[in-house]
Amino acid sequence: GLVLAGPVGVKFSGVTERDILDMHSMPRPAFLAKAWADPAQAEPDYTAMSDTELAGVARGRESLALFGWKPYMHDPRLRRWLHRIDVPTKLLWGEQDGVVSADYCRNWCGEIAGATLETIPNAGHYPQWEQPDAFAAKVAAFAATLS
């Protein structure tokens, strides 16, 4: 089976409409307020990180800019391949996700045969970090249906 958490990468709406929040058009605190149900959980203590850990953070942001800049956060070719996914698929969406909407996730379900969507309360775009127990329970329940 396949589990997708607040997926991005596909353009469903028209050319001038945003499917995915433009994180680069706002100050970081504003983005964090949209992405997290509790923005206080969002940022680690960078001053406590080792140089290796900080380099990892920088590499992650560099990769995001490289792969998500243009076209913004999607691959124009991806949507045409979604119908080929032929394994049971569960989409998980944080109820307070301001990065992608529930409708955006429902569009994914419409492209993947049999895919279903579940929400996780008190979570934003990163339910696996904000509500790890609820996230793990939903993944485990889904996995149990695969046997």
Language model features with spans:
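Flexible "cap/lid" loop of the alpha/beta hydrolase fold
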Residues: 1-30
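Hydrophobic/aromatic beta-strand patches that form the interior of the parallel beta-sheet core
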Residues: 3, 90-92, 118
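Short aromatic-enriched loop/helix-cap "lid" or pocket-rim segments at secondary-structure transitions
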Residues: 13-18, 103-105, 130-132
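Hydrophobic, aromatic-rich cap/lid helix
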Residues: 51-80
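Glycosyltransferase donor-binding loop in the core domain
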Residues: 70-73, 97-100, 124-127
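Short alpha-helix in the alpha/beta-hydrolase fold that links the catalytic acid
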Residues: 78, 87, 101-110
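Short beta-strand/loop motif that positions the catalytic acidic residue
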Residues: 85, 91-93, 97
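Catalytic active-site module of serine/aspartate enzymes centered on a nucleophile-bearing elbow/loop
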Residues: 114-147
